[in-house]
Amino acid sequence: MHINDAVFLEDLCPKFRLRQWRKSIHRFTGKSCIYCGKPSESIDHVIPQSQGGLSTTENCVPACLSCNGDKSDENALYWYRRQKFYDPRRAMAIRAWLEGDLRLAIRLLQWANPNIKVKNKNYKKDESEYKAA
């Protein structure tokens, strides 16, 4: 049997691929909200879909339900600057994430919160494997 003859689960079930992509985004931050550091329970679009934001790794970040709901359809960078828990290190991490530099984003988040434990340090693999939702 050749590799071209193989059938892959993600080809048969797009929801499986989407679920794996979402899990990989949470793993990047050790399952913590990129905005406040609490446990992440959702994926937030930094640039909202209503403003043309895409469902790509660079535009989707792990967020707690509180931050995701409060931010709503606002641009994350503008919204984040007005929060009481604003941290310039996290703001730089959000900017790095948007620019596709996940390695820098994770380092900045670890600087802001040394308790973050990243399970998967292979940023390149996850970034390319789960590019779009």
Tell what function each PLM region has.
Residues 1-31, 88, 95-104, 108:
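Short, charged surface segments at domain edges that flank catalytic/cofactor-binding sites
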Residues 4, 10, 43, 125-128:
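Intrinsic disorder/low-complexity signal
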